[in-house]
Amino acid sequence: MESLNSAAGLCVKSRRVEEIAMPAYWVARSRVTDPVEYKKYTDPLPPIFAKYGGNVLARGGRFQIMEGPEKFGRFVVIEFPTFEQAVACFNSPEYEAAAAFRRNGAGEVENVIVDGGDATPR
């Protein structure tokens, strides 16, 4: 947006710079050891993710490990509007209550939240 400062008799152009929010991705790799208890963890998750703007992109579908150990057998990818919203969801009381079922021996999970976009220095 450009504006002219005519009150001071100057012709000055100013630009408003807006920061564009990048999405973030919560990636979970899981190994289920007790399916009944694990379901108590997964059942309440969709509305919790939605509350924080999360959108499940992949959950429990077909996969192929291309490289590395075959330790995990379930994969989930959730997109959030921002990194901060994804972290807030993970740290929320609602998620903590659900995760308690998994943490009590129903499965092993590796959770990672990563910013979208290419942040590699050039």
Predicted segments with their positions:
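C-terminal structural segments of small proteins and small subunits
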Residues: 87-89, 96-112
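Short S/T/G/P-rich N-terminal loop/turn motif that feeds into the first structured element of a domain
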Residues: 4, 9-91, 115-122
